[in-house]
Design a protein with these regions (language model features):
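Residue-level recognition of tetratricopeptide repeat
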Residues: 65, 99, 103-106, 144, ...
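Alpha-helical segment of the N-proximal tetratricopeptide repeat
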Residues: 55-86, 106-114, 156-159, 268, ...
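Canonical tetratricopeptide repeat
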Residues: 96, 141, 189, 223-224, ...
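Conserved structural position within tetratricopeptide repeats
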Residues: 82-85, 123-130, 171-178, 208-213, ...
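Short coil turns that delineate tetratricopeptide repeat
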Residues: 88, 133, 181, 215-216, ...
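Start-of-helix register in tetratricopeptide repeats
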Residues: 58, 92, 137, 144, ...
Length: 498
């Protein structure tokens, strides 16, 4: 018996729907395609973060300005470099970067570091002018950067390059003023260029024009005005201008060094030691403030300690002076010039034996235990700290800046010579080198030529006497040393040394 199948009263039998199947197939194929694209990186996840968070240019500029004011110039440079990376066609930012790079060179120690930073600043300044050839400030900052590149200490072996920088700096200054003759920065920077060209009257004229402008309340303007007054010998007027610049940029230590040097120069002119003492102490305050700021912002610069040492030397406090030179050597234990300065301090304090080690390191170089003796230590012992480590020092060639170390060294060697400890061989070699330098560069020694010759002749006479009869040189030690101390180590210059 056939029984008909039961009808589905409550449930429908499943049936295939061709449209639904097609949709599923398309979704599966689409998913496979999506996975392949994600794997190859052609499609990024919707909420995946960007590789580098995007920051607005204004954010970098604010960060750079804040670091500049705080004295963290390396961080300021980094911020401005990021700003020009985001917006490479912004001439204003390139110009600001160049200005900061230029000023940052004052916080660097070696000439090689300064040269590298200043050349980078020059590239930035040229880029700003390239992007905005009609912008007065861009040309002014290029002039400023060129002027700071024209540094005779950096290019001592290529003075023609210094002249080239100065000529171009003047051209850019004139271009800046041609674009806008009321630009305060352009007026100030041009005054600085004129000052370095020794056109002092014109420099004074243009800085006065800058000071008359309503926006003259700028560190750059006060700094240049102070430099002009300082060069003209008006030290008492230069100091308040440096103070105004310091008030705007309180972490720019080179401003403190200049102000302190002006106080020391004023003190040197005061004949009464009691009256001069407070002025010297004011000088020390500025130098010590510079050292403290450097410590706070992480700048390892020996300059403040050398400035403190010079001030104590002028006060006749040679023990304190020597301690500060030794502190400077902790920052730069291979700098031969600092060894020379320590040797001069020892010499002026009549520590003649100690001066020999330091001066020898300065002009002949030294290494091993001799390097520690040159720093005033008994011997090297790195276990006591890094300041007791051995170092290799390369001697300084004779030049107008180093000749003082040579003739003092020769003078001490000859004066301390004895029949059984004759140092005249080395002394006479030094004297020969000094004479050769005087002949080779007579223009550099116009003022001190005769004094240096007298010192050389006194030393040669000692050695000649010793060679003839073996008489001990101690009988003429006083003559040899008393004619020497002030030569080449005083601050009797138009622009005081920090």
């Amino acid at each position: 018996m056939n029984i008909a199948p039961r009808r589905p009263l409550f449930n429908r039998r499943p049936q295939s729907n061709i449209y639904r199947m097609f949709l599923w197939v398309m979704m599966i194929l689409g998913g496979i395609w999506m996975i392949q694209k994600l794997t190859t990186g052609e499609i990024k996840p919707l909420f995946e973060p960007t590789p580098t968070p995007t920051r607005a240019v204004e954010s970098f500029l604010l960060e750079g300005e804040a670091n500049f004011t705080a004295g963290n110039l390396n961080n300021a440079i980094t911020a401005y470099q990021e700003a020009v990376r985001v917006n490479p066609n912004d001439a204003v930012t390139w110009a600001k970067l160049a200005r900061i790079q230029t000023y940052s060179s004052a916080f660097l120690i070696t000439n090689a570091e300064k040269k590298e930073r200043l050349l980078l600043a020059l590239e930035s300044a040229r880029r700003a002018v390239e992007l905005a050839p009609d912008d007065s400030t861009a040309h002014a900052i290029l002039a400023f950067t060129l002027d700071w590149n024209a540094n005779t200490s950096i290019y001592s072996d290529d003075l023609r390059q210094v002249d080239k920088f100065l000529v171009e700096a003047e051209q850019e200054s004139l271009m800046a003023l041609q674009k806008d003759n009321t630009n305060t920065l352009a007026l100030a920077y041009y005054a600085e260029v004129l000052l370095d060209q020794q056109k002092w009257d014109l420099a004074e004229q243009f800085i006065n024009q800058a000071l008359e402008r309503e926006d003259s309340n700028q560190m750059d303007v006060y700094r240049v005005n102070a430099a002009v007054l300082e060069t003209l010998g008006q030290y008492n007027l230069a100091i308040p201008e440096y103070d105004k610049a310091i008030a705007i940029e309180p972490n720019f230590t080179f401003l403190y060094l200049r102000a302190g040097a002006n106080y020391r120069r004023l003190a040197l002119a005061i004949l009464d030691p009691k009256a001069a003492r407070p002025v010297y102490e004011k000088s020390l305050e500025y130098f010590q403030k510079a050292a403290l700021i450097n410590e706070q912002i992480g700048v390892k610069d020996p300059t403040p300690y050398l400035s403190i040492s010079r001030t104590y030397s002028q006060l006749g406090e040679f023990f304190a002076a020597a301690l500060n030179v030794q502190a400077a050597l902790e920052f730069e234990p291979t700098n031969p010039d600092i060894y020379g300065q320590l040797g001069v301090v020892y010499f002026r304090s009549r520590n003649y034996e100690g001066s020999i080690f330091s001066l020898k390191c300065a002009i002949r170089g030294c290494s091993g235990d001799d390097s520690c003796l040159g720093r005033g230590l008994e011997k090297c012992n790195s276990a006591l700290g890094p300041e007791y480590s051995e170092n290799t020092i390369i001697g300084l060639p004779i030049s107008p800046n180093t000749i003082v170390y040579y003739y003092i060294y020769g003078s001490v060697l000859s004066a301390l010579s004895r029949p059984r400890d004759n140092k005249c061989g080395e002394a006479n070699q030094i004297f020969s080198e000094v004479r050769a330098e005087l002949v080779a560069n007579p223009d550099a020694y116009t003022d001190g030529y005769q004094t240096i010759i007298n010192i050389v002749q006194a030393g040669e006479a000692i050695c000649q006497s010793l060679a003839e009869d073996g008489a001990p040189a101690s009988s003429v030690l006083g003559e040899a040393v008393t004619s020497t101390p002030e030569v080449g180590v005083s601050d009797m210059t138009a622009t005081p040394t920090p």
